[in-house]
Amino acid sequence: MNETRTTVFVQDVTLRDGMHAIRHQLAPGEVAQIAAALDVAGVDAIEISHGDGLAGSSLNYGPGSHTDWEWIEAAAANIQRARLTTLLLPGIGTVDELRKAHDLGVRSVRVATHCTEADVSAQHIETARDLGMDVAGFLMMSHMAAASELAAQAALMESYGAHCVYVTDSGGRLTMDAVRDRVRAYRDVLDATTEIGIHAHENLSLSVANSVVAVEAGVTRVDASLAGQGAGAGNCPIEAFVAVANILGWQHGCDLYQLQDAAEDLVRPLQDRPVRVDRETLTLGYAGVYSSFLRHAEKAAQTYDLDVRTILTEVGNRRLVGGQEDMIVDIAMELSEVAADR
């Protein structure tokens, strides 16, 4: 008897999470090139928006070089087969932005909340379902909630209508066992028809390993990006993940060489800071800090003549979450005053 092959839905996040790595500065022409390359390379879905989701362009999160609509239009015009996806954080993006994105061709949305605040996603998930969209719940900073607590939040998102719920390791803090425990906890409480996804970051150099363990535990949707382009040390590098998937005999639609070419030729040249594990990005994972805080902390460190790691460690101690970017400057000011008093 032939065993059923593991099938993986590969979701590329280069044009959304990858925006953090380049401070949300990307021309529509560059979006068009990358989207076209991803589509030809066979990814299942392509996510596009400001790094912090629809309407994320702001002084707090970082202004984008262009609007979400310009980026979405550029991607939509160059995708023939992949599912065009976007991200929405309730409190930043609204159902009006969601409807406009749908009008421009977006057919899937991930509704993201902090890992203990799934209840704020109800209106947005329900609206997306009413629009006929594929909907995933995105529980960010998943390391900050125990597996059972996180699973209860996932069940809430499912009850609102989510087709899939993600273990979202925004801080790149989860180890393989921690990922496995959370996926199994999801599976214990979610309906068999509800999919589970994994969104990993590379801060502890575990993004590929965590994604593989997640699939082995029952995940079907995997986030990844070209050259790992993403916040902090980046996301799971799609080329490496696809290579491992090939070795393991998993079924997917991606062409490894085309992904490698797109990563090297289109994405790496965009980086104004290497997307890699280094002393700063490793600190993100070690301290359990939201990966997109990196560039904000680096700017504050330069302004107040501090070690970035000192700021990030204190951010981790205070358990800051997405949306509290403005507090990074406050922390830097406090640390600078303490240093001056010594």
UniProtKB/Swiss-Prot annotation:
Belongs to the 4-hydroxy-2-oxovalerate aldolase family. This is 4-hydroxy-2-oxovalerate aldolase 2. Residues 8-260 form the Pyruvate carboxyltransferase domain. InterPro entries: 2-IPM_HCS-like, 4OH_2_O-val_aldolase, Aldolase_TIM, DmpG_comm, DRE_TIM_HOA, PYR_CT. GO terms for molecular function: 2-isopropylmalate synthase activity; 4-hydroxy-2-oxovalerate aldolase activity; manganese ion binding. The record marks 16 as: Transition state stabilizer. Keywords: Aromatic hydrocarbons catabolism, Lyase, Manganese, Metal-binding. It catalyses: (S)-4-hydroxy-2-oxopentanoate = acetaldehyde + pyruvate. Its EC number is 4.1.3.39. HAMAP family: HOA. Pfam families: DmpG_comm, HMGL-like. It is an enzyme of class 4 (lyase). Transmembrane segments: none annotated. One of its GO terms (biological process) is catabolic process. NCBIfam families: 4OH_2_O_val_ald, PRK08195.1. Substrate binds at residues 16-17, 170, 199, 290. Mn(2+) binds at residues 17, 199, 201. It comes from Nocardioides sp. (strain ATCC BAA-499 / JS614). It comes from the Bacteria. The active site is at residue 20.
